[in-house]
């Protein structure tokens, strides 16, 4: 696909900002670079805006997202309710705590987070 940053983007000095969007996506999926679907995945993930978030909760995030393959996801999960194809499963979730730390660091700066103490946590988790 031919991509051009239009004159208004160039004049506004946004070329670097546009490239900042594309580079993290390739780095995010770097562990899959030897897979046959890597190029298509990078193209798909760079084809439009993404809404990046950080969620937390002991064991709940994976349950809310559902399985990578929507066909294996339970009703009531995001993928179980809204997806039918593994290649277009609408949402990404880190598969391990270690990967989550790397992915969060790739997409967010430390100053973008709010530090808070969740008072109910002591009453929910042991």
UniProtKB/Swiss-Prot annotation:
CDD domains xref list: NDPk_I
Required cofactor names: Mg(2+)
Organism listed in the record: Merluccius merluccius
GO biological process, alphabetically ordered: CTP biosynthetic process; GTP biosynthetic process; UTP biosynthetic process
General function of this protein: Major role in the synthesis of nucleoside triphosphates other than ATP.
Active site: 92
Gene name in the database record: nme2
GO molecular function terms noted in the UniProt entry: ATP binding; metal ion binding; nucleoside diphosphate kinase activity
Top-tier EC class: transferase
Protein name: Nucleoside diphosphate kinase B
Assigned protein family: Belongs to the NDK family.
The protein's Enzyme Commission number: 2.7.4.6
Intracellular or extracellular location(s): Cytoplasm; Nucleus; Cell projection, Lamellipodium; Cell projection, Ruffle
Residues reported to bind ATP: 6, 37, 68, 79, 89
Main localization (coarse): cytoplasm
Reaction catalysed by this enzyme: a 2'-deoxyribonucleoside 5'-diphosphate + ATP = a 2'-deoxyribonucleoside 5'-triphosphate + ADP; a ribonucleoside 5'-diphosphate + ATP = a ribonucleoside 5'-triphosphate + ADP
A single cellular component GO annotation: ruffle
InterPro entries: NDK-like_dom, NDK-like_dom_sf, Nucleoside_diP_kinase
Keywords assigned by UniProt, alphabetized: ATP-binding, Cell cycle, Cell projection, Cytoplasm, Kinase, Magnesium, Metal-binding, Nucleotide metabolism, Nucleotide-binding, Nucleus, Phosphoprotein, Transferase
